[in-house]
């Protein structure tokens, strides 16, 4: 049965396998893909010093940004396949799909360790067919890799296999450091499985298990000394003063609940969690594991998700909640399954499938109404040019779509202030374009769930030729960016959602 779930996941993941990255959180997808492209073109130098083709404020003179956060696994693993077969976008997607399949397998195996095989299949289905997994398990982002690594490390800790568990956890934290909190329950599971009875044995196993992840992380971070100065490193990320979302306001909780509920657990998952808490079936697991899982998830939410409230960061806690939900459904296995219960479960399953389809469609809908126009504008720009983009995010997506170095400007005041220096730094073009405004996790709040459900009947919105209601409005003739650029610069290309200008210095007033 679990193979059938994996096959169904592959069928859904095959949707637009070779297309551009335009779906939910495409900015982050294109950032990872850009790093991978540099690996495919430059080889080991782009692995040791990962980079992307957009520039950041304060570093405008440099036509790229060094990103020493996650290790570029998509680039490293995909490199030989791209050299042999080409098809870069297909290859990087297939790598994510492979690790999503690993994660489904690990959820199944973990549950089978504690429950019956049928419960393992339920958990694998809840996880593998969750809208968040169907989306982020197909795109070139590191989140499915780190989640699969976390689950793999936990499974091999239960066996117990110290070297392989340690290796999977090293992979997980190199893919994304944020999952380091889950080392606590993984190590706890290993120590319990090894039946450590003395403090000396406890310390020895802990040191042996943690040595590879610690040394690997230190080696990766130490390579920063050979990099050009960049704000995007593991060390600077950890040390950055960012208070994150307020715990006193409702916005953070609305995002978290919206992401975990219908985008994550679904109807059956939420019901299972309630059943697990009511029937206390989760107590079948060792109390020490439960306590450390609770602590690590609380720390992860407070330290990671509160600071970066984006949907892909939901995947690790979602995996543990799916396991909790499966314990809940397993609690019904010993009781009579009468007609009324069968009807109720059937209705819940039907509603779960409907909701999963709706919210998966929302995540996989294009956020760019005019990718063809953007690419056509890119064809008018000579190779190795530098382009200013009027854009609400940091510029990773335009760098891929235009195949140029880009610098994002977020307001007319910012553009006017920075323009003289940007021209000196070699920026010769300005591109204005409209994209969906909710490319971050904000659209997953509870206030948007009903709107998303209604989009089932408007699936064409956001595709070429179809206006979307939530587009940023930069290209309208009365929009501030257009009013600033029209008459100052030579217009090279203009459509409803894309306008390209040449920065001829003689035209600038």
What would you call each of these model-derived segments?
Residues 165, 367, 379-416, 423, ...:
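Short periplasmic/luminal acceptor-recognition loop of GT-C membrane glycosyltransferases, typified by
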Residues 1-8, 167, 210-214, 281-282, ...:
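Signature aromatic-anchored transmembrane alpha helix within multi-pass, membrane-resident enzymes
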Residues 91-115, 152:
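Transmembrane-helix motifs of polytopic, lipid-linked glycan transferases
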Residues 191-192, 260-298:
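Hydrophobic, aromatic-rich transmembrane alpha-helices
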Residues 132-145, 310:
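Short acidic/glycine- and proline-prone juxtamembrane loop motifs at membrane-interface regions
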Residues 13-18, 179-180, 328-331, 341-368, ...:
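Transmembrane alpha-helical segments
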Residues 104-109, 125-126, 145-164, 168, ...:
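Specific aromatic-rich, kink-prone transmembrane helix
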Residues 193, 204-245, 258-269:
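Membrane-lumen/periplasm interface segments of specific transmembrane helices
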């Amino acid at each position: 049965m679990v193979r059938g779930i994996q096959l169904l996941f592959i069928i859904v993941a095959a949707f637009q396998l070779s297309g551009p990255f335009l779906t939910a959180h495409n900015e982050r997808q294109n950032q990872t893909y850009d790093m991978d492209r540099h690996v495919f073109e430059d080889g080991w130098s782009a692995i040791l010093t990962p980079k992307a083709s957009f520039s950041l404020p304060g570093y405008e003179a440099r036509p790229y940004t060094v990103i020493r956060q996650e290790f570029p696994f998509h680039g490293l693993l995909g490199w030989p396949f791209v050299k042999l077969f080409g098809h870069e976008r297909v290859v990087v997607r297939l790598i994510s799909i492979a690790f999503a399949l690993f994660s489904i397998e690990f959820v199944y195996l973990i549950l089978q360790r504690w429950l019956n095989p049928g419960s393992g299949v339920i958990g694998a289905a809840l996880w593998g067919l969750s809208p968040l997994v169907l989306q982020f398990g197909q795109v070139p982002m590191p989140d499915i890799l780190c989640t699969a690594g976390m689950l793999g490390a936990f499974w091999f800790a239960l066996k117990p296999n110290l070297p392989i568990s340690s290796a999977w956890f090293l992979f997980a934290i190199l893919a994304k450091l944020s999952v380091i909190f889950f080392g606590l329950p993984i190590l706890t599971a290993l120590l319990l499985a090894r039946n450590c009875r003395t403090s000396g044995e406890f310390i020895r196993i802990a040191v042996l298990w943690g040595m590879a992840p610690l040394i690997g992380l230190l080696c990766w971070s130490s390579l920063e000394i050979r990099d050009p100065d960049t704000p995007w490193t593991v060390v600077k990320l950890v040390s950055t003063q960012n208070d994150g979302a307020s715990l006193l306001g409702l916005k953070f909780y609305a995002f978290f609940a919206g992401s975990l509920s219908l985008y994550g657990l679904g109807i059956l998952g939420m019901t299972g969690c309630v059943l697990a808490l009511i029937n206390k079936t989760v107590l079948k697991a060792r109390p020490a594991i439960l306590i450390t899982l609770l602590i690590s998830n609380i720390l992860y939410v407070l330290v990671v998700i509160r600071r970066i409230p984006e949907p892909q960061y939901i995947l690790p806690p979602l995996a543990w909640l799916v396991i909790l939900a499966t314990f809940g459904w397993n609690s019904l296995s010993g009781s009579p399954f009468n007609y009324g219960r069968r009807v109720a479960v059937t209705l819940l399953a039907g509603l779960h499938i409907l909701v999963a389809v709706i919210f998966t469609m929302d995540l996989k809908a294009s956020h760019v109404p005019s990718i063809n126009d953007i690419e056509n504008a890119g064809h008018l720009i000579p190779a190795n040019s530098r382009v200013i983009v009027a854009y609400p995010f940091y510029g990773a997506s335009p760098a891929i779509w235009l195949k140029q170095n880009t610098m994002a400007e977020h307001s007319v005041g910012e553009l006017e202030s920075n323009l003289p220096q940007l021209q000196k730094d070699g920026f010769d073009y300005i591109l204005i374009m409209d994209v969906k405004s909710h490319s971050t996790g904000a659209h997953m709040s509870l206030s948007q769930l009903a709107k998303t459900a209604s989009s089932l009947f408007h699936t064409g919105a956001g595709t070429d030729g179809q206006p979307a209601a939530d587009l940023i409005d930069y290209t309208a003739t009365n929009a501030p960016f257009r009013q600033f650029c029209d008459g100052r610069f030579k217009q090279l290309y203009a459509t409803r959602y894309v306008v390209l200008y040449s920065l001829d210095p003689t035209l600038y007033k």
